[in-house]
């Protein structure tokens, strides 16, 4: 970890890993600025000059959110691109020239699932501090993310299936690694997609939360 700042002093501008590190560092900076609104609210009582800074950050919330989303999409696809240069280190069932796209799509599914999963535990722990508006709209947020998660996971499943067939990797399914690939696709991609779809349709909040735990575990 002590060598992480090296990339800023000796930048390898032709390296994918440099782009990943730069995006992650910038992304963490944006997150820190967004989060600074909360501590500045009570620190401004002792340090009045922080009130002006807090107002500036609050006004830029939408811009910071858009910037953060763009940065997260960049480094997710770049992580997939890292594996393109090491085909010998991955089994053919997982290696694909479309790995940057797979990383990006799977990160969207993981994001939806983590919002539901973390929100579930936050709601249990601190729901008595939340206002009535938040408590009333919390379930609708879960159902919205569940719908999105169902579409994204099913799309990811179809993309992986098509890629496996196009690259003629079907014979590998009869091997030990093929069994693990089927476990991943069926139990940790297709199953939560179906659970999300059923939970959002039937408005079953417990089923949606269980699906999020399943997807996060996968």
Predicted regions and their residues:
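Membrane helical hairpin/interfacial module
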Residues: 1-5
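Long, contiguous internal "core" modules enriched in hydrophobic/ aromatic residues
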Residues: 9-201
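Central hydrophobic cores of alpha-helical transmembrane segments
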Residues: 207-218
């Amino acid at each position: 970890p002590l060598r992480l700042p090296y990339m800023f002093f000796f930048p390898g501008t032709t390296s994918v890993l440099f782009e990943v590190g730069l995006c992650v560092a910038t992304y963490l900076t944006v997150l820190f600025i967004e989060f600074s609104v909360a501590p500045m609210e009570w620190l401004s009582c002792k340090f009045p000059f922080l009130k002006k800074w807090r107002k500036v950050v609050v006004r830029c919330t939408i811009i910071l959110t858009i910037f953060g989303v763009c940065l997260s999409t960049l480094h997710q696809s770049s992580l997939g691109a890292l594996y393109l240069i090491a085909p010998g280190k991955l089994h053919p069932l997982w290696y694909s020239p479309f790995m940057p796209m797979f990383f990006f799509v799977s990160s969207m599914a993981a994001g939806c699932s983590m919002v539901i999963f973390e929100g579930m535990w936050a709601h249990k722990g601190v729901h008595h501090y939340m206002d009535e508006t938040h408590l009333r709209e919390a379930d609708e947020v879960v159902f919205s993310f569940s719908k999105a998660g169902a579409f994204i996971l099913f799309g990811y499943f179809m993309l992986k299936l098509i890629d496996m067939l196009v690259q003629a990797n079907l014979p590998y399914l009869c091997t030990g690694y093929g069994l693990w690939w089927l476990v991943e696709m069926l139990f940790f991609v297709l199953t939560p997609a179906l659970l999300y779809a059923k939970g959002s349709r039937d408005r079953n909040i417990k089923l949606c939360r269980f699906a999020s735990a399943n997807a996060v575990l996968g």
